[in-house]
């Protein structure tokens, strides 16, 4: 940030291809594009849409083309929780049709309108759509007790695949669209960040029949003495306490949080708990076998835990910790109270079949009372085992031992391992990948659970409120597919660090940051989550990391803050009402010693119009749902069936739209028609087939299993980025990009499409998958650009692979690029810290057999596999995929 003069890179001297469009010009403007009206910026999204409806009605009545169109006051409608209005598609070059809403639409209540588009005319696809909110939930004011922007749940918490619910199961099946919701009850790793309002008076009003919680969409009856449940229609009495505060002073019930807001939290009274909320409890199981010593994992994990002790959740100072070291033996540590001395004893148990607990009272200890001795132990553990050459790792017996220590209270078992479990119960063998990789037997033989222990043990853990998290860091096979079941069924997670070595500070930084954020996120225990639907709706399938205790109850020994869930919904009977309701309730014990209930409610309009169903479909939520079904297909019938399922789902929707909507409402010739709110959905579905979780080809089993595991639980924004990476052109980014704005926030450049057709051979690009970043430097980049970014003019001197950019004091551009990377790594809602991989593009001047040729080729292949609009191995480009869909739907 010195007085360094901005450099203009002379890219024009290279003639390898057309200059890519600036990020704000993702595709050329068409003749039909018009500037937005300035007045609209002062309207709410609902008001803006309704103004458009009124304009259309007024214009039509003036022309005597439409009759009996009601004039609606736009101020009587609220669209809660959505920041932007429904966006009509931008006209693009070559568009030959008039984009007007069409189809059979409801009269008398506001609904989203259908805007037709031609998918071929939308190429390259407008990726800014990926950051748009879903189609709005338009709910009239008379449906809400106290109309407000917070009366309906934000899509950050809950997104339904359809924001207009079909009134019959027949219409749902006819649409070929899924009905499900994507749920994320907690939005941050720490509960103190932007919490919902908390009711502390102990007055929790619920329907006595369906047990739903009172919410902004109920109806008060008989002068306010009773309320009608909007879920089952039962009239309930209003308790006297509802109109009083905690001191018994009368209050206005319409000011209550649960009446004004869709997301609210209650301090639960004692009848919601079977015991006193337990303390936060952690059992750390450290692999101390040869692999963990050799790659430095043990030392890294011990040091990170030591440095994180101050940040462990310990609000009530009741947090307890135990540490086990494991090779072929279970090593317990007896840690005395600080006031009783500092003599720490290590006790070894070699009987793996029936491990006993020597002196359990001194092994599961208070963080507050034993803090100094815990620090001493963590600093000594790497030295104690530094000479260990034993290759055995008894994971199963260690888990049972840790479970025995904490089962009386519950909590987390956190395993840090570099070795395949190879002794004792749960022993696993290396699988023969070469013979079945990329065949029909791959899923059944490489991704199935190798030992029933890893599923059966989770039943015991759920009974005793114990979650298991795994951190696997190795350059060898660890059978991710088997051990990840431990977290999958206990509300936990499995994290994977292939090729980890403490000799590489990039690996150390990634592991340390993620491990630290994981163990310091807020811990809630004894959690259950239940979803309710109003009459006609039923939760039928559940996807995510939890234990499905009953038909509609999901159990979590501890509740994570960085995962999401998918619930499939069935329509069991004809819906007669104009609106339906969904409600999520999470009951848990916080580490503050409080029992709390978080309630999330959403109101969704219903329809008997197929056009309105399509106009309200949420393309991002649909993609998440289909990924869960595809994962099911992988495990039941293999990868080929999963890819066919994804392609067939797109084909069926396109065919249905063509037959039921487009053909009956338009004349002439768009080659491949769909509605604007779904125009990115075929791209996302096609991108899924190219993801490591599903694509064909020889992929190491651990990597494949880890990719599937991530898709099971990633929150929606990170899920979308993982399957369709964000790509930024840096060498020509706007002047303000990479610098702080007036609020101190780093400005990011606009992303470009994930295709190599926009890459120049002299350019600098950043690809961000949320898990990894690739900084791609064109092989023919000018020396000035190379110098400004890397501090050298010789492109061959740049170290490729995992790395970080050097800090160049006199290069503003270097600082701007680093700022962009830092900004993309900033998260308070997920633990992931993406590794940066520096990739050098090909060049005719590149030496044939330079020292890093093999590594560079591998990196290029990995990076270009993220450009999902291109061919990835034998797959179609996105244009070819659309052409194949056109052919199939024309038959």
Swiss-Prot record:
It is a peripheral membrane protein. Keywords: Cytoplasm, Cytoplasmic vesicle, Endoplasmic reticulum, ER-Golgi transport, Golgi apparatus, Membrane, Metal-binding, Protein transport, Transport, Zinc. One of its GO terms (molecular function) is zinc ion binding. It comes from the Eukaryota. InterPro entries: ADF-H/Gelsolin-like_dom_sf, Gelsolin-like_dom, Gelsolin-like_dom_sf, Sec23/24_helical_dom, Sec23/24_helical_dom_sf, Sec23/24_trunk_dom, Sec23_24_beta_S, SEC23_SEC24_subfamily. SUPFAM superfamilies: beta-sandwich domain of Sec23/24, C-terminal, gelsolin-like domain of Sec23/24, Helical domain of Sec23/24, vWA-like, Zn-finger domain of Sec23/24. Residues 207-232 are annotated as: Zinc finger-like. This is Protein transport protein SEC24. The keyword Transmembrane does not apply. Zn(2+) binds at residues 207, 210, 229, 232. CDD domains: Sec24-like. Its main location: cytoplasm. The COPII coat is composed of at least 5 proteins: the SEC23/24 complex, the SEC13/31 complex, and the protein SAR1. Golgi apparatus membrane; Peripheral membrane protein; Cytoplasmic side. It comes from Eremothecium gossypii (strain ATCC 10895 / CBS 109.51 / FGSC 9923 / NRRL Y-1056). GO terms for cellular component: cis-Golgi network; COPII vesicle coat; endoplasmic reticulum exit site; endoplasmic reticulum membrane; equatorial cell cortex; Golgi membrane. Component of the coat protein complex II (COPII) which promotes the formation of transport vesicles from the endoplasmic reticulum (ER). The coat has two main functions, the physical deformation of the endoplasmic reticulum membrane into vesicles and the selection of cargo molecules. Pfam families: Gelsolin, Sec23_BS, Sec23_helical, Sec23_trunk, zf-Sec23_Sec24. It is found in: Cytoplasm; Cytoplasmic vesicle, COPII-coated vesicle membrane; Endoplasmic reticulum membrane; Golgi apparatus membrane. The gene is SEC24. One of its GO terms (biological process) is intracellular protein transport. Belongs to the SEC23/SEC24 family. SEC24 subfamily.
